[in-house]
């Protein structure tokens, strides 16, 4: 691990109070650890702007599995896509609804296109792409 460098940040008192509340609520050991996580999150989000870099993501879906041919259309998109599907997890929420997570690796633009195609299928009630990347620091 690199050496740690201390620096200071000036904040309005209300923002500092909110920071301390978040640090406490979320169980962080310190303001520094909370701030490091925020910086990492910003760097990961910005890395998604570089469409050529290989990244990872998780697509979370809730859909009605009885809907006309939805499962087959979803599988066709998965098999025909140019992203790597690492893992899927399927949960039967109730008699009609399924929760599915799809872990994906590929270029940012291809992952987003894949997620958009599946989200646009009739019968998909909820779709959220969680963007991730392994920080290089």
Curated annotation (Swiss-Prot):
PANTHER family with a match to the protein in the record: NICKEL-RESPONSIVE REGULATOR
Coiled coil spans: none
HAMAP family: NikR (MF_00476)
UniProt keywords, alphabetically: DNA-binding, Metal-binding, Nickel, Transcription, Transcription regulation
UniProt keyword Transcription present: yes
InterPro entries registered for this protein in UniProt: Acetolactate_synth/TF_NikR_C, ACT-like_dom_sf, Arc_rbn_hlx_hlx, CopG, CopG/NikR_regulator, Ni_resp_reg_NikR, Ribbon_hlx_hlx, TF_NikR_Ni-bd_C
Pfam family, one: RHH_1
Gene Ontology MF: a single term: DNA-binding transcription factor activity
Domain of life, source organism: Bacteria
Protein name: Putative nickel-responsive regulator
């Amino acid at each position: 691990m690199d050496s740690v460098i201390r620096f200071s940040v000036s904040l309005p008192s209300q923002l500092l109070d909110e920071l301390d509340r978040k640090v406490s609520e979320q169980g962080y050991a310190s303001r520094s650890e909370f701030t490091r996580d925020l910086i990492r999150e910003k760097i990961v989000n910005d890395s998604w702007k570089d469409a050529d870099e290989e990244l990872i993501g998780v697509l979370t879906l809730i859909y009605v599995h009885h809907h006309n041919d939805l499962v087959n259309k979803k599988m066709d998109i998965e098999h025909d896509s140019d992203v790597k599907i690492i893992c899927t997890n399927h949960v039967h929420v109730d008699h009609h609804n399924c929760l599915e997570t799809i872990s994906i690796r590929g270029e940012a633009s291809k992952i987003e296109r894949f997620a958009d195609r599946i989200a646009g299928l009739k019968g998909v009630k909820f779709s959220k792409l969680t963007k991730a990347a392994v920080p290089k620091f």
